[in-house]
């Protein structure tokens, strides 16, 4: 490829609204162009990288037995209504009407679509298992699109779905796809982790995320320093904590505690640890057609994990869509006094009350007395009836691993893949069944598997690039080599550049010849910005000494290569990481 023919509109400066380096570099280097909020055009350089990522994905998925299909991006809203997700998904689901007043959605995921296909065409256990996947455009109407391709509204996704006759078969395919995803991310040269995760709006009994480690990541994962335990902070667990020695021994009583509203200040007032203070956190619960309140109790030195709290509510049948901070008006309407909320008589104020599971043996506790400037001491939760307990706290770095007691540590990460065991939920709601070996009708066991193809462009750059521009991995760079001529007006240098270009092409090297009549410094700046793996410099000394200077983009390391061994050395360098 000649640079003069390449459509790569580089910019002098990155967009002013770009925060992450991946967004800055992709826009400034001419990879992407923004159409609207969270919507991007992929220009030739980005398309080359996308093609490489997609080719790796196709190869590994098909090696693991998955079959490639292409489903409609537009899906009947009635299918989403049958599955129950039309309301559950919320405003992120874009719904529209056609000219005949039929409702459709732009798919963020395609569980309903693929389940309908299976229901119509898979009739017998003899056709199972089957794993179908696609790479296609998706749309999710994000409330706050940001960070370029990391949180876009329109994106490219590899999504796959498997159908099975029983849970054992699903378990095998779950592990099979996990292996395929590991191979894909290894091929892409990424440092990643596989972590236990929340299933969210997709649903299912179990899920795992594939996350790329980067300080700019949106997510926090919790990792054990001693064993392989790793989980998204939204569902991370910890081992049971030892009780502090300073136990506040007291008979049940009510004490005046003026202006003492935080767990820390209450602990100091009673000369004990926040561990023994019952902290109440009130949230507004958003349902399909109403709003209610929920109160969550945790120990004073713990924090509420909102995802765990929402899941706990739905386990007890709340059918909650979302949790929000309760306003002062909400508290006043319910007769609650912030800083003094406790379990006594609370049920008449709040319909949903959940205690963290660490409080099951809770005694000698200090709680709000549901009266301004008063707390109760000597509270024993075992004296209350029908309390609901669940794991609702956010794991801290001072906590210990639930598997081996090792120290837990936070890491920032960016999710690039997610696999789910869906079970029979979608099959039952959409009446998707088959006949088993005994001729009896059974619902499919399903799996769901996704990788963010367009997000991977950002993930690679967040992990690998530097302040100068794009640094791609071995299998993802748009070009292997860019040939940079020091003085394009020098006919001898120009002639040699074309000769070298042809020599490299004949060896299968994807080379870019910078044939622009531009300053050498500007050409090198574009090399740093665009991120070809190697830059081969042709200058006056090349002609005199028959030696080339070669620069690795990954670390800007320079190497001198003799003309006689040019092809051999270039291929050697490209084969290495």
Curated annotation (Swiss-Prot):
PROSITE patterns: AA_TRNA_LIGASE_II. It comes from the Bacteria. One of its GO terms (cellular component) is cytosol. InterPro entries: aa-tRNA-synt_IIb (IPR002314), aa-tRNA-synth_II (IPR006195), aa-tRNA-synth_II/BPL/LPL (IPR045864), Anticodon-bd (IPR004154), Anticodon-bd_dom_sf (IPR036621), Pro-tRNA-ligase_IIa (IPR002316), Pro-tRNA-synth_IIa_bac-type (IPR004500), Pro-tRNA-Synthase_IIa_type1 (IPR023717). GO terms for molecular function: aminoacyl-tRNA deacylase activity; ATP binding; proline-tRNA ligase activity. It is found in: Cytoplasm. It catalyses: tRNA(Pro) + L-proline + ATP = L-prolyl-tRNA(Pro) + AMP + diphosphate. It holds the Pfam family tRNA-synt_2b. The keyword Nucleotide-binding applies. Its EC number is 6.1.1.15. PANTHER family: MITOCHONDRIAL RIBOSOME PROTEIN L39/PROLYL-TRNA LIGASE FAMILY MEMBER (PTHR42753), PROLINE--TRNA LIGASE (PTHR42753:SF2). Consists of three domains: the N-terminal catalytic domain, the editing domain and the C-terminal anticodon-binding domain. Homodimer. Belongs to the class-II aminoacyl-tRNA synthetase family. ProS type 1 subfamily. This is Proline--tRNA ligase. The gene is proS.
